Swiss-Prot record:
Keywords: Carbohydrate metabolism, Cytoplasm, Glycosidase, Hydrolase. GO terms for biological process: lateral root formation; pollen development; primary root development; regulation of timing of transition from vegetative to reproductive phase; sucrose catabolic process. The keyword Hydrolase applies. It is an enzyme of class 3 (hydrolase). Belongs to the glycosyl hydrolase 100 family. This is Cytosolic invertase 1. Its main location: cytoplasm. It comes from Oryza sativa subsp. japonica (Rice).
Amino acid sequence: MELAVGAGGMRRSASHTSLSESDDFDLSRLLNKPRINVERQRSFDDRSLSDVSYSGGGHGGTRGGFDGMYSPGGGLRSLVGTPASSALHSFEPHPIVGDAWEALRRSLVFFRGQPLGTIAAFDHASEEVLNYDQVFVRDFVPSALAFLMNGEPEIVRHFLLKTLLLQGWEKKVDRFKLGEGAMPASFKVLHDSKKGVDTLHADFGESAIGRVAPVDSGFWWIILLRAYTKSTGDLTLAETPECQKGMRLILSLCLSEGFDTFPTLLCADGCCMIDRRMGVYGYPIEIQALFFMALRCALQLLKHDNEGKEFVERIATRLHALSYHMRSYYWLDFQQLNDIYRYKTEEYSHTAVNKFNVIPDSIPDWLFDFMPCQGGFFIGNVSPARMDFRWFALGNMIAILSSLATPEQSTAIMDLIEERWEELIGEMPLKICYPAIENHEWRIVTGCDPKNTRWSYHNGGSWPVLLWLLTAACIKTGRPQIARRAIDLAERRLLKDGWPEYYDGKLGRYVGKQARKFQTWSIAGYLVAKMMLEDPSHLGMISLEEDKAMKPVLKRSASWTN
C-alpha cells in the first residue's frame, strides 16, 4: 500500500489558504529557496560535552559525524539514513494507516500557497471552534515528524521559518512585554477574501487559559530544527543567521542568571502540554526534560563563531548541573522511596541528605503500592519541602530520548510501564499523569476545574498522541514489544472513535467528555509510532545518545533515625 503522497496530493483547508507579502521580510528568500534533495545524507554527531573548548578556540560551523542508533538486529549502530517509510515496508500496513494519512492531510493549513502546518483538530461536528483551528507549536511536532519520515520536509521547513518570523514580533500581555525570545503557543491564518491577502495572527499566551506563556514552544522548536536537520542531512537551514539568532534568543531566556539555587527552570502552572491549573507550578519534569533535550540539540546546531561560542560554553556548564540535579533528586525507585520514608528533617548543614526538607509523612499512600521492586521514574516536581510524586508520561519519555535518564534509569522506566500496565496504559495508551487527583485535593489543586475532573483530560486522562513518544522510548531501550502491544490497543479504537483528543476513565475506556474528534496530533502520533516501529532508523531524528562526559549520578546514603 503506497503511503507517500506528493505535494500535489495535499488537501487544502478552505478557510486556511494564505498569502501575505508584508509579513515575510528577509525570510522570504529562505522560503523561496529550491527544494532540497530529500535523499538522506550523513548527518551531524551528538557531540560530547568534553569536546567543547573553553580556551577560546573553535570553528564557525557545526560538526559532522554519526549518531549511535538502536538496531533491532543487535545493539547500537550508526544512522546512515532514514528512508521514506513507504519504501521499505516489510509487511502490509494496518488498514487504518491510509485513513490516518488522509485525515492528517485534511488538517493542513496553507500560507502563500505553501503548506505551513496542521490545525489542532478538524472536527466539523463540534459547534465551538475555540482555538482548535489554530496551528500549535507543540501539537505540530508529531505532524512534522510524520512528514519528515514520509520524505516531505518542505512543510517542516516552512513551519520553522514562519514561527521564527513570529518570534520577532513584539509580544505584550496587557501592558507587560514578554521576552524577545519567546515563541508563540499557536498561530492562525486569517484570509481577507476581498483583498486576496492572508495574514498571520500569533498567540503568545495572551489568549490562553490563565494567560500563561508557553515555556515549551521554544524547546520544541529547537528539537524540531534538529529533527529536520537529521532527517534531511541539510545543515544550511540551521546555519542561517536567522535560525542561529532564534536559538540564541530562546537560550537567553532560559540561561539567564537569577535568584535560583537550582539548575532547573522555575515555571508557572499551565506553561506546557498541561496548560491548565494542575499543580505543576515550580520545576515540572516535562519542562526540565524538554529543557535538557533542547540544550543538547542546540549544542549540535549552534555555530562556534563569536556569538555562538559563549552559548556553547554556557550550555555545557548547565547540562552538567542539570543532569546531576535531575538524576539525583527527581529519580524515584523502590530503594529511594524507602530512603525518603526514613528521612530525618530539619537538617542544617552542607552534609544534609534531605536537602529539600521533605517531610516523610507527605508521601502519598498510593505510592507505596504503586512502586514495584523493579522499576522507577522521574517524579513530577521537586522544590523546597515539596515532592510531587505523580507519574508524568511526557517528561519520562523525553528523559529517555534525550538521555537525561541513564541507561539503567531508562530500563527501569520501561520496567515500571510493564509492571503497572493497567494503571499507565490500560485500554488506551497513554496516561498523561498518574494517579488522578480528586475530592478536596482536586478542589484545592485545580480550583474546581470542571474539565480536569478525576481520570479526565490532564487529570489522569489517556492521550493517544503520547503513543509516538512511548514507541520511540521503547525502541531506544530495546523493548519494541511494549510499543507493539500499545499500538495494537490503539488500533482497535482510534479510527472507530474518530481519532479523539483524549480518553477518560481509570482504564482509558471512554472517549473524553469534551474530547475533539479528528484531533491532529492523535492522528500524527499514531502514524509516527507505526513508521518508527516499521523502520527504527527513524528514531535518529528524535533521539540523543548518552554523553559519556556527563558524570553519573553519585550514590547518596540514606538519612534515617536510629
